[in-house]
Structure formats: C-alpha cells, structure tokens
C-alpha cells in the first residue's frame, strides 16, 4: 500500500503542468511510497496537455475522462476510486508542493494518529489569498475545529485519511459547481476526530495565474446550486456521528454561519450592482436555507452579524442593506 496518493485534476493546462508535476515527483518522501494520479477532464487544447502528461509515462498514473464534466468533482472522485493509499492529498493543477510536503505531513499524521493533516499555505503572485488564522498557533497535534479556525480553511488542498472517506462513502457532489470542496471537507470533519496542523514550511503554494482561464471551476454555479450545497453542509453538521451533542452541533452550525456571512459567495449582494430581481432571488434562496438551521445556533454567530442574520431570516432586503452598512 502506498502511503499517499496525490490526486490532481487537469484541464487545458499545457506546458504549465511541468512545474506542478515536478513539484510532486521531487518530494523528499521515498518515490515508491507515494503516487501522483492525474485525471484529465477531457482537455480540448489540441493534445497539448496530454502530450505533457505522456512525457511522465511510468512516473504517474493517468486517466482521461470521456467527456468534460465542468469542474473538479468528477475528476477527483475518479482519482479517489483509483487510490488505494493510506492518505490522499488533493492538488490543483496550477499549484505547487514544497519538497517536504508529503513526508512531513504524513509523518506528523502518523505520530498523532491524524485523520486530517493541514499544511501551511503560501501564495505566489497576486489574486487568490490563503487562510492565515488557522496557522497562527504553529504546529498543532490535536486541533479543534473552532479553536483553531478550521472552518476558515475548507478547501480540499490537504491530506485526508482514505479509510475515513471509504468508510463513510464521502465523495464530491456533482450537482453544484461551487462550494463542493467545502461540503467534502465538512463531511469529512463531521465523520472524523483527529486533525493536525503543520506550519514548519509553506507546504502548499497557491499559484495565481490570471493569464490562464483553464481553471476547472470556470463553469459557475447558480444561486440554487450554491445554496443547495450550503444546505447539505448544515445537514452534515446536524447528522454528525462524531459530534452527537446537540448543543455542540448548534455551536458548529453557528460558527459556519459566521464564516458564510463573512466570506460566502456574494456576501455583499444587498448593496451590490446586482439587478433588483436578482437580489430578491438570492435573498429568497439564502433565507430558505438559513431558516432550515435551528435558531439555537444563532447565539454562536459572531455578534456583529446578528442584525444581518435576522434580516436574512426575515427575508427583508432593506434590512439586509442597512445591516451591511453597519458592519
């Protein structure tokens, strides 16, 4: 059994793939202990991406999907099916791994019986930012979702124990084109106990490249899809077999609501340049979703968002506009 499978979806990445692949193949971990699984989402760049991957024949495992799926969910699920490793690590095709990433995170996970190991992020270029609060306390062998701000680092660019995924049949949902990585991570967190944070290096480098339009998330989700995903996140919290105490579930839900209000999609929709009818539709979806969440969770929402949260529950656009201006 391999120690780690690195799962990487690709789509029209071309020559830029060389740098990402090299960052995986040049790890300090023994090469026979890990593998790189590349799943191509049916690139249509006249074979440029496939030609790059073919140069690594024998060094990587590769599969191309028969048709384009539109985002990373189907490729990642395909990679999960192919992996038989102890841990899986999800990597975006334009990002980079520090040479010690797999060895350090795996060893730290084994030392602490970790289900999830989160390595510190770094950024190259301007654009996408990375979570910082989660890493402020340095290395944490036994992290807490709330105390260590894990809800603010919900991308899947981490190391997950494969047995937890398999046992609980966790997979990426394909009904939405956004926040599906949040849902995967939340479902994993709600079905596992031990989380570790490693900060010795910037283990995962997010590369900002806005000359490229080939991100797998280029197909945007609708409001209906987005809030359907958010609804599933709350369901996962309230169905957790690990966090069975109802008050703890309320606390987790409240903290996720804070994250949603602080960083969620179109968080400032009420005072944005959206059309009035689009604002009404967005608020309707938001209100329906949040009103499925018990009010007992509201006391755990950060206080500055109380007015906005209540306005959303009341489906009152004017009140949301006023609350936003008071933030």
From Swiss-Prot:
Cofactor(s), names only, from the UniProt record: Mn(2+)
Reaction equations catalysed: 4-O-[(D-ribitylphospho)(n)-di{(2R)-glycerylphospho}]-N-acetyl-beta-D-mannosaminyl-(1->4)-N-acetyl-alpha-D-glucosaminyl di-trans,octa-cis-undecaprenyl diphosphate + n UDP-N-acetyl-alpha-D-glucosamine = 4-O-([3-N-acetyl-beta-D-glucosaminyl-1-D-ribitylphospho](n)-di{[2R]-1-glycerylphospho})-N-acetyl-beta-D-mannosaminyl-(1->4)-N-acetyl-alpha-D-glucosaminyl di-trans,octa-cis-undecaprenyl diphosphate + n UDP + n H(+)
Chain sites annotated for binding UDP-N-acetyl-alpha-D-glucosamine: 9, 41, 68, 76, 92-94
Record annotation: effect of changing residue 92 to A: Loss of activity
Variant or mutagenesis effect after changing residue 255 to A: No change in activity
Phenotype upon changing residue 262 to A: No change in activity
GO molecular function: hexosyltransferase activity; metal ion binding
One annotated GO biological process: cell wall organization
Keywords, sorted A to Z: Cell wall biogenesis/degradation, Glycosyltransferase, Manganese, Metal-binding, Teichoic acid biosynthesis, Transferase, Virulence
Function noted in UniProt: Attaches beta-O-GlcNAc (beta-O-N-acetyl-D-glucosamine) residues to the C3 position of poly(RboP)-wall teichoic acids (WTAs). Attenuates immunogenicity of WTA and protects S.aureus against adaptative host defenses by allowing bacteria to evade recognition by preexisting anti-S.aureus antibodies. Also protects the cell from podophage infection.
Protein name: Poly(ribitol-phosphate) beta-N-acetylglucosaminyltransferase TarP
């Amino acid at each position: 059994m391999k120690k780690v499978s690195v799962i990487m979806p690709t789509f029209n990445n071309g020559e830029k793939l060389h740098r990402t692949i090299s960052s995986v193949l040049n790890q300090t971990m023994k090469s026979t202990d890990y593998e790189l699984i590349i799943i191509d989402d049916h690139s249509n760049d006249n074979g440029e991406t496939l030609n790059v991957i073919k140069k690594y024949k024998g060094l990587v495992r590769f599969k191309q999907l028969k048709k384009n799926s539109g985002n990373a969910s189907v490729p990642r699920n395909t990679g999960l099916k192919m992996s038989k490793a102890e841990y899986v690590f999800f990597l975006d095709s334009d990002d980079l791994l520090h040479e010690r990433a797999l060895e350090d995170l795996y060893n730290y996970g084994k030392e602490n019986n970790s289900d999830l190991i989160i390595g510190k992020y770094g950024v190259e270029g301007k654009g996408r930012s990375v979570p910082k609060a989660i890493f402020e306390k340095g290395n944490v062998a036994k992290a807490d979702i709330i105390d260590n701000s894990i809800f603010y680092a919900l991308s899947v660019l981490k190391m997950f124990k494969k047995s937890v995924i398999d046992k609980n049949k966790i997979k990426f949902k394909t009904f939405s084109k956004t926040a599906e990585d949040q849902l995967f991570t939340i479902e994993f967190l709600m079905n596992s106990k031990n989380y570790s944070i490693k900060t010795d290096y910037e283990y995962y480098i997010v590369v900002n490249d806005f000359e490229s339009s080939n991100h797998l998330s280029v197909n945007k989700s609708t409001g209906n899809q987005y809030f359907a995903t958010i609804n599933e996140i709350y369901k996962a919290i309230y169905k957790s077999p690990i966090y069975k105490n109802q008050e703890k579930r309320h606390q987790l839900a409240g903290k996720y609501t804070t994250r949603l209000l602080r960083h969620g999609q179109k968080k400032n929709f009420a005072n944005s340049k959206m059309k009035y009818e689009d604002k009404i539709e967005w608020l309707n979806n938001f209100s329906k979703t949040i009103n499925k969440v018990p009010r007992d969770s509201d006391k755990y929402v950060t206080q500055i968002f109380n007015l906005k949260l209540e306005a959303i529950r009341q489906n009152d656009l004017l009140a949301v506009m006023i609350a936003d201006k008071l933030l």
